[in-house]
Amino acid sequence: MSADFAPYWQQTLDDLARYPARPELELLPLRCTDFATLYSVRLSSLGPYRLFGYLSIPTGTGPFPAIYYAPKYQSVLEIIPQGTANLQRSAYVTFALAGRGQRNADTPYAAMFPGLFTEGIDHATSYIFRGIAADAVRGFEFLLARPEVDSARVVVVGNDMALITAALHPAATYVVTTPALFYNTVELAPKTQAYPLEELNDYLRAYPERLEAVRATLAYYDLRAFAPRLTATTLLIAGAAGPLLNRQALTPLVAALPGRVTVYDSEQSSYKDGLYIERWVAAQCGIPEVQRILPAHWQ
């Protein structure tokens, strides 16, 4: 962990606070159903930079539990994750956010994939993920301000950015995180040729003289540094026995988390993993009859 980890992130949050969110919502009738209403959302983040998201609100009387889909490492934003049943929107307020560079939030910066992970990585103050982390916090603030949301039942879901968001904003009650980018990155990347970590290998082959600068930047983002700040009940998705980020590799991260933690070993099946996550989230949020919101092919 960097010696000035806390000041770095406090400065990021202070800088973010200087920019009002100024949200604009637009009804999307084509994506509305009899059980949920969908809006596109535009709001401002650090920069200022204009972001995009999808907000879905269940029909009926709230407040409802909420799921926040933090920005992913992919170009396209989904309303809910591919493969998830649309009926999830009948039980939860859902908000999915595109961070800067993702499609619909790609003006003036359109990210490349691969490419986003290493954008500005040799300078901590200009690293693109400083802005993306601020974006994730801003989206979470927007969701929490919605009157339809039960603030005691808010789940942040995603990769590393889910854990980072919940560590930077204490209001998350539950977290589902699948580490992929920011765990012991410089040491683990040379052991794989799989993306996204191979992107770092590509970068350091091109710029080997920047290794120590990259290491210094990534010290601000390592999940082990964020872990002590996390108060939410956490579901951590570990890789299967073979991959780098398996249960054994993630043991130091689990040990650093102060709250209740469940570690789930991925079965490398979107069905099996998705079913476990849906049931875990429903149990935490007190959603009865979870079967009714599962995809038909999962039942």
Model-found features: residue ranges?
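N-terminal targeting or regulatory segments adjacent to alpha/beta-hydrolase or S9 domains
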Residues: 1-36, 289-299
